[in-house]
């Protein structure tokens, strides 16, 4: 089932750590990406903009296959 705008999601560790995006940045991803709820605030093509509200952090673009419903 595809992820929709406004849905609560979390990142899938295995897919994010082994992605092309991970090779371009620091691979020490913070735990909140995998353990807390994030809200999908926008979707463009294969990417979703996710806002994690538990901690004061910037929104992050993740591929749709790197997130799952929480």
Curated annotation (Swiss-Prot):
UniProt keyword Thylakoid, yes or no: yes
Membrane topology note: Peripheral membrane protein
Reactions performed catalytically: a plastoquinone + NADH + (n+1) H(+)(in) = a plastoquinol + NAD(+) + n H(+)(out); a plastoquinone + NADPH + (n+1) H(+)(in) = a plastoquinol + NADP(+) + n H(+)(out)
Main location: membrane
Any one of the GO CC terms: plasma membrane-derived thylakoid membrane
Listed EC numbers: 7.1.1.-
Coiled-coil residues: none
Location(s) in or outside the cell: Cellular thylakoid membrane
Pfam families: NdhO
InterPro entries assigned: NdhO
Gene Ontology molecular function terms on file: oxidoreductase activity, acting on NAD(P)H, quinone or similar compound as acceptor; quinone binding
Catalytic class of the enzyme: translocase
Key words, A-Z: Membrane, NAD, NADP, Plastoquinone, Quinone, Thylakoid, Translocase, Transport
Domain of life, source organism: Bacteria
Family assignment from sequence similarity: Belongs to the complex I NdhO subunit family.
Subunit record text: NDH-1 can be composed of about 15 different subunits; different subcomplexes with different compositions have been identified which probably have different functions.
Function: NDH-1 shuttles electrons from an unknown electron donor, via FMN and iron-sulfur (Fe-S) centers, to quinones in the respiratory and/or the photosynthetic chain. The immediate electron acceptor for the enzyme in this species is believed to be plastoquinone. Couples the redox reaction to proton translocation, and thus conserves the redox energy in a proton gradient. Cyanobacterial NDH-1 also plays a role in inorganic carbon-concentration.
Official protein name in the record: NAD(P)H-quinone oxidoreductase subunit O
Gene name of the record: ndhO
């Amino acid at each position: 089932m595809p992820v929709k705008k406004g849905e609560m999601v979390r990142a899938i560790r295995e897919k994010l750590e082994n992605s092309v995006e991970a090779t371009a940045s620091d691979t020490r991803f913070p735990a909140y990406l995998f353990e807390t709820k994030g809200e999908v605030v926008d979707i463009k093509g294969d990417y979703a903009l996710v806002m994690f509200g538990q901690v004061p952090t910037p929104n992050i673009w993740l591929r749709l296959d790197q997130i799952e419903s929480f």
